[in-house]
Amino acid sequence: MIKIAVLGYGTVGSGVVEVIQTNGEVINKRIGEELEIKYVLDLREFPGTPVEHLITHDFEQILNDEEVKIVVEVMGGIEPAYTFVKKSLLAGKSVATSNKALVAKHGAELLAIAKENSINFLYEASVGGGIPIIRPLTSSLTGDEIEEITGILNGTTNYMLSKMYNEGADYDAVLKEAQARGYAERDPSADVEGHDACRKIAILSSIISGKLVDFEDIYTEGITNIAANDIKYAKAMGMKIKLLASCKREGDKLDAIVAPCLVEPSHPLYSIEDVFNAIFVRGNMLGDSMFYGSGAGKLPTASAVVGDIVEAAKNLDRSMMSTWDSEKLELEEKAETKKKFFVRMQGDAETLAEQVVNIFGPVELVQVEELDGEFGFVTAVMSEGTYEECAAQFPQIIHMIRVEA
């Protein structure tokens, strides 16, 4: 019998218990041994629940129990999760976590400790919820040079942008609806300002590069400045606006960014709607591949965590995960990265077109009949630095959105 402890009995923690209890027979068959939850760590009591007699308030009880072979961290946040996870690994216990903040900040260190102790630190659920992406990158696709990962990694913002596109609603209205449905927190900044997606792409970037990609080094822009009029231009061009998190190889560097982008119908991420997530992966041998599914939610995320528990249980005395170095990878300078840009500008297109072309070079003009006193245009491919230099000469610019190739 393999005994585990679950740290945290919130949404994901209760989901982990539910998955194990519901699918216990098939889980045990896949492990080849019975799995038992011995402890659930939480500050609260849960009378009348399946974990009523498993609750402990003392982490040291778990740490000092040699019967506990796997610790499941689903508390969230950095502390005390980091301390508990590190102590568990140093004590020879494998860890499965869904904590993206923990993995993004301390993943390199925790993976190294696990490797030194011939145990595992597993984190499939930290990116994409129930979408399997970590294990494919660390096992199935290890024969490939991964050239690009671009994803819709936050369900809240994808839901909001989908509503704005399909219903013509403005940002504030769809945010309130997302909060009412439980998709967005009372303080939605982690989602709408792009921080959640940033941590996730930092983890994926670290995996494919083998070095630490610091989330604080990734240029991050959320959707708070996306207005209903931006959506009207997108529709006029036959495109959609998506919050994309991407990392692309540029020589020996990575170009990593989180930002709203205009996406053409031919792009695999164009059709991803509502709260769903999707991750586009391009390998030099694989070609293009897509991973799609529920990127959050109690049971999809818990399912991914339990998948890691099963892997840890099957490999109790063997470290099976690849790691990344603690040495930071230098990212491509934002000013050097190249793409097309969509620009909204106050004024009359006929009056300003010549000046725009003289500064920006060839552009494709875009006009929306119902929007008076402004127009839009799409530039040719240019560097971010060049765009900024050109844009500085036009105080009439209302907004800019990058165009995903």
Where are these regions (language model features)?
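N-terminal glycine-/serine-/threonine-rich beta1-alpha1-beta2 phosphate-ribose binding loop
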Residues: 1-90
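General beta-strand structural signal in soluble alpha/beta enzymes
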Residues: 55-56, 96-98, 121-125, 148-151, ...
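Rossmann-like NAD(P)H-binding beta-loop-alpha module
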Residues: 68, 115-196, 203
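Rossmann-fold NAD(P)-binding glycine/threonine-rich loop
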Residues: 81-87, 91, 98-137
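Substrate-binding/catalytic subdomain of NAD(P)-dependent oxidoreductase enzymes
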Residues: 175-271, 276-278
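Low-complexity, glycine/alanine/valine/leucine- and proline-rich hydrophobic stretches
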Residues: 260-284, 298, 359-371, 381
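ATP-dependent carboxylate/acyl-activation modules
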Residues: 268-323, 330-338
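A conserved regulatory-domain signal marking ACT and ACT-like small-molecule sensing domains
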Residues: 309-405
